[in-house]
A protein has these predicted regions:
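Catalytic cores of enzyme domains
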Residues: 1-171, 175-197
């Protein structure tokens, strides 16, 4: 179970979807947008890896979920890229959940970043937008304990048949309030002010 990684650092990159295309999910235009952004994410990982190689460091690009043995969501959360949302995807304060990831494994001595909270957990607890929009009702209203960790959970036994039947979906990321252009950073600031008042 697992494999060994010799590189000590991981760089996470994210490229944002065009909202006008992704909001059409599950239509083919949204699927094409996802593929365009996977391509952009892969190109960014390869460009960064090539630069690191040029600088004398080992670097291995990981260009998407089907081209890598690394699960990027846990790495992205650990790197502070975002938090897990109710819909099972990362929510980044700037991009919402409307983006695609790539990564680069490297031995370059880069500074480490840490997980960051921008209020997603509290927000998702009170929000039902993705849950109500999900045609197969795969998004659970409450967290579930999975492998000893209580977290947001998507029932993939419900999600995947719908996803496969429509050759993709993405409704949950398209309707997420964080994904609307210009909303995420303002929402994160508002939630931060609210947390500071409570503390």
């Amino acid at each position: 179970e697992g494999y060994s990684v010799t590189q000590r650092r991981i760089i996470i990159t994210g490229v944002q979807h065009d909202f006008e295309n992704i909001k059409l999910a599950p239509e083919p235009e949204a699927g094409a947008e996802v593929m365009r952004q996977y391509t952009r994410a892969a190109n960014s990982a390869m460009t960064i890896a090539a630069w690191l190689h040029h600088e004398g460091w080992e670097a291995r690009p990981l260009t998407g979920p089907m081209a890598s043995t690394l699960t990027m969501i846990p790495a992205a959360i650990a790197a502070g890229f975002g938090e897990l949302g109710k819909h099972g995807s990362i929510i980044n304060p700037e991009f919402g959940s409307s983006f695609r990831l790539s990564a680069i494994l490297t031995d370059a001595p880069l500074p480490l970043s840490k997980p960051k909270s921008h209020g997603v957990d509290d927000f998702c607890s009170a929000c039902r937008v993705c849950e109500d929009a999900c045609p197969p009702f795969a998004i659970l209203p409450e967290k579930k304990t999975v492998r000893g960790i209580k977290k947001w959970y998507v029932d993939f036994d419900k999600c995947l048949p719908f996803f496969n039947q429509h050759q993709g979906c993405g409704i949950c990321i398209a309707v997420c309030p964080w994904s609307r252009p210009g909303v995420g950073l303002n929402l994160a600031e508002k939630l931060e002010r609210k947390r500071n008042r409570v503390n």
